[in-house]
UniProtKB/Swiss-Prot annotation:
Binds to the 23S rRNA. Belongs to the bacterial ribosomal protein bL9 family. Pfam families: Ribosomal_L9_C, Ribosomal_L9_N. The gene is rplI. Keywords: Ribonucleoprotein, Ribosomal protein, RNA-binding, rRNA-binding. It comes from Nitratiruptor sp. (strain SB155-2). This is Large ribosomal subunit protein bL9. GO terms for molecular function: rRNA binding; structural constituent of ribosome.
Amino acid sequence: MKVLLIKDVKNLGKAGEVKEVKDGYGKNFLIARGFAKLATPDVIEAWKKEQAKKAQEEAAEIEKLKQLKEKIESTKLVIKHKAGANGALFGAITNKEVAEELKKQGIEIDKKHIDIHPPIKQAGEYEIDVKLGHGIHAKLNLVVEAE
């Protein structure tokens, strides 16, 4: 029996491959557990269309993230924070504060995607890494001013 693998199956193959398997293994294990479908021409064609659609959506998502990266990298963010006489901040700048300031400028970024390392505890200029997904990273220019 020929089956189209929907998910990766150890010792058999990767998703999207058509494999010849024994009838019992195909019906009772692979198809029953949702790892595969019976490989008919209609099923194979539907799978190919679905994969093409997913690839197109992913390409659109990557393009959108690249545009967001350009917008972030062209932005200079200024945050005012209470500080002592020598420029040492009372507390550190958090990723939540950075996310809120970006939101005020019309850029929606989840605070989990903002990587501030080491913590910012001094007034000055910093470059912060923003992880956008799909391996795309943006560098945000941050200026911390003492209040």
